[in-house]
Regions:
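Active-site glycine-rich loops that stabilize anionic/oxyanionic intermediates
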Residues: 65-70, 213-214
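Acidic catalytic loop of the alpha/beta-hydrolase fold
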Residues: 187-188, 213-219
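C-terminal catalytic histidine-bearing segment of alpha/beta-hydrolase fold enzymes
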Residues: 225-271
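Short beta-strand element of the alpha/beta-hydrolase
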Residues: 57-67
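Catalytic nucleophile-loop/oxyanion-hole region of alpha/beta-hydrolase
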Residues: 73-75, 80, 95-129, 249-255
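Primarily recognizes the serine-hydrolase "nucleophile elbow" in alpha/beta-hydrolase
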Residues: 113-203
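N-terminal cap/lid segment of alpha/beta-hydrolase-fold proteins
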Residues: 2-55, 104
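Short beta-strand/loop motif that positions the catalytic acidic residue
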Residues: 208-211
């Protein structure tokens, strides 16, 4: 029999921190050393940021900050975006995933676990279980891409860690209805993929891009979006003139959140 999972019960409407792995059950544990970018007692978790009271719930959005996998830039990326999305009807979950020396695969397992949890408790969060999107900024978007490419559906952490024992939460799909790449792409750190065949075989969800022309990865973003589009995936692309890397929730010259809301609302309504 598959062992039952044991995690915090949701507190809908009230902010909450939810730890993703039970003690001793996190896939791919490593010996702690001083070279780590998180403290020894760090545990992957997500922060639930509820829809504003009185606002109709549209669905859920998982948010993963950038930071080159050496820090999580939540104050510039995820927190201000969550504030905007909460007012627009989205239950937001800021995922505090593992950093170096863990790999983007292990970080993607943290995100997949978070997606499964939100889907399992969809009724409590007043969402349709299909209406879950993942959004990442820079390295956080690379992590989201890793998750939707390789750690979706019924793929469990046992595919990466042979010692991992799946629990009942692993029986829940880790699929997403959409992905947002905010100054990011499918690939690895600093290297966007243009593997059309991989994208085609992966049955990617609709993909949203927002980036600026002054970003050092500007041409890689364009090439990545073109390859994803060539693979037959629905792509929404917003390029902001003169904008650099790291504009977070946007400004008057990179106001991507309303565009994302319009796009995602249509996806959720037609799920």
């Amino acid at each position: 029999n598959t062992p039952a999972f044991n995690m915090a019960v949701p507190t809908p409407g009230e902010a909450q921190t939810i730890y993703l792995w039970e003690e001793g059950k996190m896939p791919c544990p490593r010996e702690y050393s001083s070279s780590w970018n998180d403290p020894e007692d760090f545990k992957p978790h997500m922060e639930y940021r509820p829809v504003k009271k009185g606002v109709e719930v549209k669905g859920a959005v998982m948010l993963c900050a950038g930071g080159a996998f050496v820090f999580r830039g939540n104050w510039g990326d995820t927190y201000p975006t969550a504030d905007k999305l909460n007012e627009l009807g989205y239950q937001c979950f800021v995922v505090q995933y593992r950093l170096r020396p863990f790999t983007q695969e292990e970080g993607a397992l943290d995100l997949a676990r978070a997606v499964r949890y939100v889907r399992y408790y969809a009724d409590e969060y007043d969402i349709d279980p299909n209406d879950i999107a993942v959004v990442g900024y820079s390295a956080g978007g690379i992590l989201c891409g890793e998750q939707v490419l390789n750690w979706k559906g019924d793929v469990t952490p046992a595919a990466l860690d042979e010692n991992y024992i799946p629990d009942t939460l692993d029986l829940v799909s880790a699929d997403s209805a959409a992905i947002g790449h905010i100054y990011s792409f499918y690939g690895r750190l600093s290297v966007g993929s243009t593997d059309v065949e991989k994208f085609r075989q992966s049955n990617l969800p609709p993909t949203f891009y927002a980036y600026g022309t002054e970003d050092p990865f500007y041409h890689q973003f364009m090439a990545n979006a073109d390859a994803v589009r060539e693979a037959g995936v629905s792509v929404e692309e917003h390029c902001y003139e003169g904008q650099p890397h790291g504009f977070g929730a946007g400004n008057k010259n990179s106001d991507w959140v309303p565009e994302f809301d319009r796009w995602l609302t249509d996806i959720y309504e037609n799920n």
